[in-house]
């Protein structure tokens, strides 16, 4: 049985969730040296941002998973997407390393909710005979996100548009794209 338009849209949204997660992670990796320079620390000091982002995902998976079970996956997923988009972009405005790390920890909580909510909503929405293929499609979002981050970083980082040079802070503003939809 072919998928309906709504089912295909759910698959695309799930795929994009995984892709944007990987995009954010890789943008952080690419920009570590510039962030470290701006905050006057060594790269290992700023690499702690990777740790707190990943460590807090467990918390987010629990919180958003419970909320999704209680109030429905779709509305909680929308709340989650807005949360991680705003928190990801807020890192662009962090005036200190401490605030940057706190924002990355909160972003990790929100991002932790995306995988469980997006995957379960997708799998519940599609025909059972499509679940193997669709789970592979969802997982291919991760390398797609890495590829997109490489392209965005390669094309836009340190480029000047309208007299403004796009540094590491601008890279985090791309986090707003999911919420814009």
Language-model regions, residue ranges each:
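Transmembrane-helix signature of 12-pass secondary carriers
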Residues: 1-181
């Amino acid at each position: 049985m072919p998928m309906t338009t709504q089912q295909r849209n759910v698959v695309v949204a799930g795929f994009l969730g995984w892709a944007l997660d990987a995009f954010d992670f890789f943008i952080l990796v690419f920009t570590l040296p510039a962030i470290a320079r701006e905050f006057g620390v060594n790269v290992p000091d700023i690499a702690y941002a990777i740790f707190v982002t990943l460590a807090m995902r467990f918390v987010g998976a629990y919180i958003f998973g419970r909320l999704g079970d209680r109030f429905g996956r779709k509305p909680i997923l929308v709340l989650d997407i807005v949360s991680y988009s705003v928190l990801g972009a807020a890192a662009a405005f962090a005036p200190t390393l401490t605030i940057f790390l706190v924002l990355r920890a909160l972003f990790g909580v929100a991002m932790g909710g995306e995988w469980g909510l997006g995957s379960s909503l997708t799998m519940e929405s599609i025909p059972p005979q499509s679940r193997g293929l669709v789970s592979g499609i969802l997982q291919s979002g991760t390398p797609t996100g890495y590829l997109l981050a490489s392209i965005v970083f390669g094309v836009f980082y340190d480029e000047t548009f309208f007299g403004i040079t796009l540094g590491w802070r601008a890279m985090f503003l791309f986090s707003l794209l999911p919420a814009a939809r």
